[in-house]
Amino acid sequence: METNRQKKIGGVIQKDLVDILQGEIRKNGISNLVISVSKVSVTTDLGVARVYLSVFPQEKAPEILESIKSNMYLIKHDLSQRVRLQLRKVPNLAFYIDDSLDYIEKIDNALAGKENPIENRDLLEKRKKI
């Protein structure tokens, strides 16, 4: 369970990271790319912040994640300049791709019955318990 302090720090980091990442996209003239920070969770010791990114189009996600990880120290420096009056120490950043939308889509497809094993017997192998 996150404390109020962790939630507040996560919110501050999330807001400023969105500004930093979207500013870099605009500055470099990259079109047809949307990066959003879906969640930031901070550890209890406030030492590490896990940043979950949503990238559209999804095919570019691994490439974008690698470029963000390679520029992590520059991003952390920009972040520290923005939050220097709010935080004494900026937590280390760990970036991850947020795949919750894919997970939700798979659940919706299963509930909608698009993969109905009664109508299509080939799907039964996937559903068999081992």
From Swiss-Prot:
Keyword hit for Cytoplasm: yes
GO biological process entries: maturation of SSU-rRNA
Compartments it resides in: Cytoplasm
Assigned keywords, A-Z: Cytoplasm, Ribosome biogenesis
SUPFAM superfamilies according to UniProt: Ribosome-binding factor A, RbfA
The keyword Phosphoprotein belongs to this UniProt entry's keyword annotation: no
Gene3D superfamilies reported for this sequence: 3.30.300.20
InterPro entries the UniProt entry points to: KH_dom-like_a/b, RbfA, RbfA_dom_sf
Predominant place of localization: cytoplasm
Any one GO molecular function term: ribosomal small subunit binding
GO cellular component labels: cytosol
One Pfam assignment: RBFA
Assigned protein family: Belongs to the RbfA family.
Protein name: Ribosome-binding factor A
Originating species: Flavobacterium psychrophilum (strain ATCC 49511 / DSM 21280 / CIP 103535 / JIP02/86)
Name of the gene encoding the protein in the UniProt record: rbfA
